[in-house]
A protein has these predicted regions:
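Sec-dependent bacterial lipoprotein signal peptides
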Residues: 1-18
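Short loop/turn and low-complexity linker motifs enriched in small/turn-promoting residues
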Residues: 16-137
Length: 137
């Protein structure tokens, strides 16, 4: 049991070590998603990203596009249904990104409907995403 805990800790630390150090001249956006779902940074201002684990943007106004993959539970579909995978894009525009600040983009779903919210460093809600299309995964 102890070996499993140590392995889990090592994997967690390895994953964190892979992220670059945030640039103090830019705003950093962390991605937060429930377990068993996936959230990926796709684009900033319609420009594709190389690294899908976070956003790093210049101060000012930007539109972020994320890809959110989640599973709709059977009780949200109907009797005797099986879980259904969804693959959605969402866009969120925010006009006041500040250099050196860290933001949190959280995603989730209500049944078939995905949502994402942007929070600033003080955990104030500063933006809500708009759906940009979904398909079955």
């Amino acid at each position: 049991m102890r070996e499993i805990l140590l392995l889990g800790l090592a994997l967690t630390l390895t994953g964190c070590m892979g992220l670059p150090k945030p640039d103090p001249n830019q705003a950093w956006v962390d991605l937060n998603v429930p377990a068993d779902n996936a959230l990926h940074a796709q684009q900033v201002d319609a420009q594709a990203l190389d690294d899908h684990r976070y956003f790093e943007v210049q101060p000012g106004t930007h539109e972020l596009t994320v890809r959110y993959q989640f599973t709709v539970a059977p009780d949200n579909i109907g009797p005797q249904a099986t879980p259904l995978s969804r693959d959605c894009q969402l866009n969120i525009k925010y006009s006041n990104f500040n250099a050196g600040e860290r933001y949190q983009l959280e995603a989730g779903s209500l049944g078939f409907t995905p949502w994402a919210k942007l929070y600033d460093q003080q955990r104030r809600l500063v933006g809500r995403a708009q759906p940009a299309g979904c398909q079955g995964a």
